[in-house]
Amino acid sequence: CALPICQGLLGRAYVDLAQRDRTGDGWLEDTARQIEVLGFDLMVDREPATLRPTARIDAPVLYFGWYSGAADGPFLLPGFRFAPGAVALHIHSFSAATLRAPAEGWAAALVARGATATVGNVYEPYLQFTHHPNLLLRALVRGATLVEAAYEALPALSWQAILLGDPLYRPFAVSLDEQLTRRDELPPTLAP
């Protein structure tokens, strides 16, 4: 298979727009277009609120969204887990203000629920200086490591932005055939 999806993750993708700002929504629309080209089963939510708790969200391996201060919706349901290798980010000014309390912010909540990689902000960087999700995904698909992709997605280096995950992680480095041979090893709740 020649598609980048054949070189990486196995699961569903979710993009949650906020109808809040043309710039941020534009990044997420571009992210959704990239995911579509990759061939993922994709759900795009264009409602102003974040995903509803009743939204279908199973085997999530890619999640890009914004804009609420703390994790909510399906991410708080008992038993919710990201699929192995998941890359997840939620744009918010203080998404990584604390990593010790998953109920406060997004970064800690995403990691606590199994995300392998995320980026966030410890303090207000303003939208233009946060990680651009479309650039992050584009770099990862190209084969960049997580740290390279996070660097490319950040318009200016700042103490406000952080990366959580193995800096050498390359989510699109494992072939689809290899993933499918290991599929039976996944717990039923994570098997796509």
Walk through the language-model features, giving the residues of each:
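C-terminal soluble interaction/assembly domains
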Residues: 80-153
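Extended, regular secondary-structure scaffolds
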Residues: 9-11, 21-22
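Short Asp/Glu-rich motifs
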Residues: 54, 129, 158
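Catalytic-core segments of thiol-dependent peptidases
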Residues: 16-102
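Caspase-like cysteine protease fold
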Residues: 142-192
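Short, small-residue-biased leader/transition segments that mark boundaries at the very start
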Residues: 1-3
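Structural alpha-beta junctions
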Residues: 5-10, 30-46, 110-118
